[in-house]
């Protein structure tokens, strides 16, 4: 609520808010024992923090307290109010609002418990207090009376013949029970029975004239007949709900229809009757008894009778015994409609209004949000002076606003020249919306609205109108969405610029809290701080009381433009930074006033049981400057004739810091301790300059300074010769500032603006040698070559070296750059360290002297317009002197798959920062022939005819001989090739080999044949040297097979196969001869080149050994051998016989045997006689 108060102050020209950052260390704590102390906070009258404690128990039936807290006393005092005794459990302090000129405070309690018989209603009460906290007026001025209770109820019961007498009695018992439960002085009853005719049993007059109303039911008898339900309803409208029958003008009219089935025989339709009931504002209940209403048509008839929505007004029971089950339901529904004047979807009007749930002051008077009015559709009451209150809602829009909570939040805007009221409805359609109301002809009408997107997000729970540029008009509205859920953070705030004329209202930037707090409730509280960073745009504070497990946090966001807020916070203050253990820090906020009397805006933050006052600190800004004397380095200082030079003075540097407030306050000369570090050539590896004071490249000083300008002077030295005399020497200043606490303001400490740059860089250039006109006119030329390379073989030569030479025949050249243009397929790899030569012209010849190295930096970019790439190499940090020449080597990678055509064109261009127009010498181009490396191979396959033999008698026979060759492409590109075969086919007119070639793997291959004559004719001499039959001595068949494209890793097989004759071998006078076939791969050598060292694989041979042998007759040999063996055996036998070999040996053997037997003494056996 405080946000809208600040917006109102800004609209009325409230004092400018100063400051930038919040001091989270030196806080003022206000603490009281009141329950929920800190639920609401409000800065009031530039002196007080008013705090609500809506759950504090003051006395019996009196809840809620109000406190005023002062910064200088550090204490809080209760604000005494005369709370009417009827304001039971008011929850005072739940919402607060204030106005200025004059100062008024509005404190509200929206939970006044108002008892009306059995019901307890919730209304509200607000107290208007003056600047001295004196109670002036209450809103509303009088408590709402209990809603009227008068009810006229008619029972219309079905007496047709389809109902048995027993069931009819049960129906009368049900009527009697309902009359007993609803009977009270303000309720009257009447009864009509219908079938195909109608009978009024008693009117309202009869009911009030009898002392025992229930006795009126004793004379009711069943009519029987058809069911004329529609006509019966018409009779009720015209005969019973009339003043003649005792119906009251302002009473709620209720009709209860009880029937057991669909109407029968009735010519009158419900479409003719029901509009009459609607016009008479009769609330209708339809009770269907029996299984007939299981039928869909019967159900539709009940719905036609009943009021809308039908599910609230239709009852269906299975039988008449079940009527007693719905007695209580019917009673509760009828009780619920007490006080309603018309049968609408609203159950309540203002009985649950809860006025004061939110509040804001307008020039016409205070506005109190009434979220519970009309069944929580919501709205707001405006209380003009001396006039009746005006109720503001969406009733004219024919929109379903049930449970929308319109008025949950309120804000004031000055828009299109008129004051507008902004109301939040966070539960509208479950996603929420915010509506802008404007006053036209003393009536408030909705003019624009914006809706939420996420269910349950509470879009519009908090509002804050912001005048960004303080011109009196509202520029944008902040809409809090505290329950918006994301996986890593909870809550958001939508930044919604005020809509233009005729345009829809929409929101732009969305503000978020820190990641990691899915239940953070970011956006639960909003307030305007004013311009706290001096950019003339308002800044805001946003509370997130659910972050850090309900400890809470507050965010500060700066204005970005007249229509926007910066998306990132400038500061986050969390409860964990505060020593005290607090919860829900940021649940309420109020800012925009100077309560501490230091000229700076303060922020009051509510938490559970505690309120903290955060002060903003004075902001200092520093504007650094650096001046050099002299302003450039003289050539006499940095041009060294020798490599070693003594230290020389470069320049005097004057460093100034201008310290000032932003914005300016009345706090006097704020002092601060400033530490500044100076560094020469920050980031460079080599040292070119040093400080005289430290003899190094760094210098640090610490000073305590006040406001205004402060300067320091330092001397710079050149310690040695410099190689880079192109790039200026830089002096980098880094500084930090710590404010000196102001004792008179309780040690309030100034601080450096967080968006201030704490560094500054100044440059000290070198003097240029450009003659009297100070314009350097260089005269550059460039040439290049390809050292030791005549042809580029793509795929073999992986690198291409380009030797570049640049000459300068004019004045000094600065930022000399050589750009090489080359086709796609080449890529820059490196540049070698170059050499620079000073040249002296002697006898018309340039002589090299003074050689030194050159470091180049190269960068490659595509030149899409020409389909080329370019590499630019520059010596930016070296002056290319007049009369000098530089050489360097550039290396390119050559892609093995590059397609460069038959010639490579390279182009070079030289230029400089001197901006001298180009000449023919500044460009150069050169062509280099190009071939493409291939790696093809042909080899003899191991599956071929290796050996054949034959006899002299088989000279006329033939045998199949097969030679196989394998062809492979092992390179990185497809290549068209020809496979050549040379095969002997005839020797001196005699056939050798009738060969055919097959190549089944490649059907596109085409083969061609031609016959070749031998080159040698002395066959015998050739064979004696080498018994090989080849194409040098025999007629040969030359086969050429053309392959249009031999693909990468392709593998092909060629088979030479045919019948080999043997008759020709006798011409060679050799028993063993080798049959040789040869193969070779050929290709276009002007385009392709075999990889170096692999040329041998372009040729292959296959040899078959042929051997001749003689066939021998074995019969003579066998016969001769047999006869000779027999003769030899006969001769040997005869000789042995003649020698007595066979007889003598046998006799001696017998004698020896006998002699051995006698010598043993054994008797000799007798020979039988």
Swiss-Prot record:
Biological processes, Gene Ontology terms: cell-matrix adhesion; defense response to virus; heterotypic cell-cell adhesion; integrin-mediated signaling pathway; positive regulation of angiogenesis; positive regulation of cell migration; positive regulation of cell population proliferation; positive regulation of endothelial tube morphogenesis
FG-GAP repeat start and end residues: 23-78, 79-138, 341-392, 393-444, 445-505, 508-566, 571-631
Superkingdom classification of source: Eukaryota
Amino acids binding Ca(2+) 3: 594, 598, 602
Membrane topology, Cytoplasmic segments: 1138-1169
Disulfide bonds: 69-76, 108-126, 116-146, 496-507, 640-721, 656-711, 770-776, 858-873, 1007-1031, 1036-1041
Residues bearing glycans: 89, 267, 393, 734, 949, 1059, 1084
Binding site for Ca(2+) 1: 467, 469, 471, 475
MF terms in GO: metal ion binding; receptor tyrosine kinase binding
Binding residues annotated for Ca(2+) 2, in chain numbering: 531, 533, 535, 539
Motif (GFFKR motif): 1140-1144
Segments on the Extracellular side according to the record's topology features: 20-1116
Binding site for Mg(2+): 158, 160, 162, 260
Membrane-traversing stretches: 1117-1137
Compartment annotation: Membrane
Residues making up the signal peptide according to the UniProt record: 1-19
Cellular component terms (Gene Ontology): external side of plasma membrane; integrin alphaX-beta2 complex
Keywords: Calcium, Cell adhesion, Disulfide bond, Glycoprotein, Integrin, Magnesium, Membrane, Metal-binding, Receptor, Repeat, Signal, Transmembrane, Transmembrane helix
Its membrane topology: Single-pass type I membrane protein
Residues in VWFA domain copies: 152-330
Domains as described in the record: The integrin I-domain (insert) is a VWFA domain. Integrins with I-domains do not undergo protease cleavage.
Family affiliation: Belongs to the integrin alpha chain family.
Subunit structure: Heterodimer of an alpha and a beta subunit. Alpha-X associates with beta-2.
Reported function: Integrin alpha-X/beta-2 is a receptor for fibrinogen. It recognizes the sequence G-P-R in fibrinogen. It mediates cell-cell interaction during inflammatory responses. It is especially important in monocyte adhesion and chemotaxis.
Descriptive protein name: Integrin alpha-X
Organism of provenance: Mus musculus
